[in-house]
């Protein structure tokens, strides 16, 4: 059997690329902890794997969930099955781009999927999602209005998605290596930090940094603006130690770099491991990402899907997920249950709304613009 191999340390975060934003998720131990001791039903379909539930439910009720690797506390799955009698059939993916064609093909009728903001938009535009019956999701009341409003950037009428987890992209810096205030993307072009800057190895993330530093939208499709951003990234390239994925976490914890572009959930973990690290959302603004729960149009267990979504919106369950994953929850009541005050009041996990005023979610820009972005990125990397 081919499976996602987990890291040895359960605290090592996010080993899969979350495109375009490149967020990293742990490869799950879920398969080993939950299914290895039990009888395993493994269905191989177009290169993917669906894992059979081990709860022993004989009612036939089930919900088929397709989620990022280790993006849920596995105990929640057990609790949901025990409390509802609904078996959870669980499959994981590494990127939105792996997930999308599998949902689009309809070969497996997934009931719940967790795409990123821009991918929700794409799935809506391509008529792949069912409207959620919110009468079956009463716990939606615990999702803060601000996140429902933000989600309108990709789901304009809030018909198809429920915010699950969210975060920001910013700069993680070492206070002992950086001797000036960090409040702007411009510091990533300071020659003083040559060979001590880490950039995300992701086309949209890299362009977001450059576009925002120039005062443009990170969703720009203006060719002149994109060309200006390309030139800025080429100018920066001699200063960059590495274009990285999950290595930014390890390098910053190990004092191997002074500055790194990173995701807020990763930054929170890094700061716990190295108290010399600080995180900031630059004043020009950044990417605010939201991963959302949706129901594909061909789902065969829609009511069970809504029951599962409702369960994840329960405050105590949201709190369990935060403790396990350390990415921000949009659930205000769940946040109040976080015992660790430093985490509950963390400015990284829960920044003040004023810090988000110039932030944007990524939009799906269309296939033609994706080609343009990728071509410009190749030009940058080849210099």
Feature-to-residue mapping (PLM):
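Conserved C-terminal helix/tail region of periplasmic/extracytoplasmic solute-binding proteins
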Residues: 354-383
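Periplasmic-binding protein-like
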Residues: 226-235, 273-297
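Extracytoplasmic ligand-binding site segments that recognize negatively charged/polar headgroups
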Residues: 109, 114-256
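Ligand-binding "clamshell"
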Residues: 124-131, 149, 155-159, 269-281, ...
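Short, low-complexity disordered leader/linker segments with a strong preference
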Residues: 1-62
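Mature extracytoplasmic/periplasmic domains
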Residues: 296-357
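Early extracytoplasmic/lumenal segment of secretory-pathway proteins
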Residues: 54-123, 250
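A ligand-binding cleft/hinge motif common to bilobed small-molecule-binding domains
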Residues: 119-122, 253, 259-276
């Amino acid at each position: 059997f081919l499976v996602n191999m987990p890291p040895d340390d359960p605290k090592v975060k996010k080993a899969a690329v979350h495109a375009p934003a490149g967020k990293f998720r742990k490869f799950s131990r879920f398969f080993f902890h939950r299914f290895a001791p039990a009888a395993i039903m493994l269905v191989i379909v177009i290169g993917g794997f669906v894992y059979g539930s081990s709860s022993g439910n004989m009612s036939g009720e089930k919900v088929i969930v397709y989620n990022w690797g280790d993006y849920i506390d596995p105990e929640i799955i057990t609790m949901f099955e025990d409390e509802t009698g609904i078996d959870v059939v669980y499959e994981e993916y590494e990127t939105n781009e792996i997930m999308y064609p599998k949902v689009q093909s309809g070969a497996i009728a997934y009931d719940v999927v967790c795409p990123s903001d821009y991918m929700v938009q794409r799935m809506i535009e391509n008529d792949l999602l069912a409207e959620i019956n919110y009468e079956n999701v009463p716990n939606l009341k615990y999702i803060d209005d601000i996140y429902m409003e933000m989600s309108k950037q990709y789901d304009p009428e809030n018909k198809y998605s429920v915010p699950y987890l969210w975060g920001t992209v910013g700069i993680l810096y070492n206070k002992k290596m950086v001797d000036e205030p960090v409040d702007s993307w411009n510091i990533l072009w300071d020659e003083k930090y040559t060979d001590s800057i880490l950039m995300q190895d992701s086309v949209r993330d890299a362009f977001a940094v450059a576009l925002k530093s120039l005062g443009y939208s990170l969703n720009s499709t203006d060719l002149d603006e994109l060309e200006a951003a390309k030139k800025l990234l080429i100018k920066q390239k001699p200063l960059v130690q590495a274009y990285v994925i999950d290595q930014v976490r390890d390098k910053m914890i190990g004092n191997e770099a002074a500055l790194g572009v990173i995701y807020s959930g990763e930054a929170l973990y890094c700061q716990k491991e190295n108290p010399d690290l600080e995180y900031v959302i630059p004043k020009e603004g950044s990417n605010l990402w939201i991963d959302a729960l949706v129901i594909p149009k061909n789902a065969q267990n829609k009511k069970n899907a809504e029951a599962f979504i409702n369960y994840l919106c329960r405050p105590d369950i949201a709190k369990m997920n935060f403790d396990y994953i350390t990415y921000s929850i949009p659930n205000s009541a769940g946040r109040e249950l976080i015992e660790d005050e430093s985490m509950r009041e963390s400015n990284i996990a829960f920044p003040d709304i004023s810090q988000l005023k110039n932030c944007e979610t990524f939009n799906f820009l269309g296939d033609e613009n994706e080609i343009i972005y990728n071509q410009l990125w190749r030009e940058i990397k080849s210099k």
